């Protein structure tokens, strides 16, 4: 009996320990969606510069097309869709951080007018939730709820993303007005070429740091190369190329300073887009509807009056 109790308590302790470990992992492990915009969020107070350039372009050097679709106009305190499209060839593979090839991921930053923000979960219609899927959006910062970020997420599944947006109500939010507003989009597919500290990733071209002759190319065990260049003044320069890019030079070759040593492995890129949306006054819409109804009724009465007049004329002619 005592052995059974000991066995029971051992099993209980083991199960509790495993549960605690799993719970700690879930809490401590950061979401992949939260990891992507951290560079821009930490380095820049505002993701859009005064020139209109979105700061993501500092790391993603190649330009690629993006598209955004929003309604022409919305009413106050209304949930609507902003559809972001990031097209690319689904068959291509990108260089991963370990030098291997893998699928592309995508990410986006959506800059809304002040007052517009991410729609609360309880305001999003079920059909819109189906379009959104498992995407997790977050504001750029606590004081910039009108700027939303997402990514990285699998490009094959989310090359088209639906952002649920809540429009402001000028009756409640005094900063909002019934006007036409711009919306700005920045979106990327694939990894960047430069890290925020200015260092290169392994997803870009590597150039020779000096002119001379390539005397030795050493392939490292974990991938990448050490390229020894003998300069004309007798010095030896060693350029390090990480795993990922492919060499396009060979031993004995005479090269110039800044000459590419590798191909450009980047297959992704960053793009910007914009759209306009009108925050429509409901009273104006009602007035417009009343006007259209009035015009329609007036036309109907004119037609009826014309037919009545024609009947009178016809009766007089017969008389």
UniProtKB/Swiss-Prot annotation:
Record-linked InterPro entries: Cyt-f_TM, Cyt_f, Cyt_f_lg_dom, Cyt_f_lg_dom_sf, Rudment_hybrid_motif
Which GO-annotated molecular functions does the record name? electron transfer activity; heme binding; iron ion binding
Q: How does it sit in the membrane?
A: Single-pass membrane protein
Domain of life of the organism encoding this protein: Eukaryota
**Could you confirm whether the keyword tRNA processing appears in this record?**
no
What is the residue range of the signal peptide feature?
A: 1-35
PROSITE patterns the UniProt entry points to: CYTF
Residues recorded as binding heme, renumbered to this chain, are 36, 56, 59-60
> Single GO cellular component annotation?
chloroplast thylakoid membrane
Where does it reside? Plastid, Chloroplast thylakoid membrane
Give the UniProt keywords, A-Z. Chloroplast, Electron transport, Heme, Iron, Membrane, Metal-binding, Photosynthesis, Plastid, Signal, Thylakoid, Transmembrane, Transmembrane helix, Transport
Q: Does the keyword Protein transport apply?
A: no
Cofactor, free-text remark:
Binds 1 heme group covalently.
Which PANTHER family does the UniProt record give? CYTOCHROME F (PTHR33288:SF10), PTHR33288
Which family does the entry's similarity section mention? Belongs to the cytochrome f family.
Complex formation: The 4 large subunits of the cytochrome b6-f complex are cytochrome b6, subunit IV (17 kDa polypeptide, petD), cytochrome f and the Rieske protein, while the 4 small subunits are PetG, PetL, PetM and PetN. The complex functions as a dimer.
Q: What is this protein called?
A: Cytochrome f
Record organism = Physcomitrium patens (Spreading-leaved earth moss)
- Encoding gene (name): petA
């Amino acid at each position: 009996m005592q052995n059974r109790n000991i066995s029971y308590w051992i099993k209980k302790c083991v199960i509790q320990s495993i549960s605690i470990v799993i719970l700690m992992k879930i809490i401590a492990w950061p979401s992949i969606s939260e990891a992507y915009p951290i560079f821009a969020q930490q380095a820049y107070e505002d993701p859009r510069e005064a020139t209109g350039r979105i700061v993501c372009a500092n790391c993603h050097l190649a330009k690629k097309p993006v598209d955004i679709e929003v309604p022409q106009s919305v009413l106050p305190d209304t949930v609507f869709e902003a559809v972001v499209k990031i097209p690319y060839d689904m068959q291509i593979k990108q260089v991963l951080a370990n030098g291997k090839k893998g699928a592309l991921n995508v990410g986006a930053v959506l800059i809304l007018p002040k007052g517009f923000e991410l729609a609360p979960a309880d305001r999003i219609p079920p059909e819109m939730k189906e379009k959104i899927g498992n995407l997790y959006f977050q504001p750029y910062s606590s004081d910039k709820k009108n700027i939303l970020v997402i990514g990285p997420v699998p490009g094959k599944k989310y090359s088209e993303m639906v952002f649920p947006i809540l429009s402001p109500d000028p009756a409640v939010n005094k900063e909002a007005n019934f006007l036409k507003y711009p919306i700005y989009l920045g979106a990327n597919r694939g990894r960047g070429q430069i890290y925020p500290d200015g260092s290169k990733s392994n997803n870009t071209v590597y150039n020779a740091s000096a002119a001379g002759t390539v005397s030795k190319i050493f392939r490292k065990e974990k991938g990448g190369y050490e390229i020894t260049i003998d300069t004309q003044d007798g010095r030896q320069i060693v350029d390090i190329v990480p795993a990922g890019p492919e060499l396009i030079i060979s031993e004995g070759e005479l090269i110039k300073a800044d000459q590419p040593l590798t191909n450009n492995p980047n297959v992704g890129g960053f793009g910007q887009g914009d759209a306009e949306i009108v925050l429509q006054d409901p009273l104006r819409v009602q007035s417009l509807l009343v006007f259209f109804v009035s015009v329609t009724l007036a036309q109907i009465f004119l037609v009826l009056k014309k037919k009545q007049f024609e009947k009178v004329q016809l009766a007089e002619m017969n008389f």
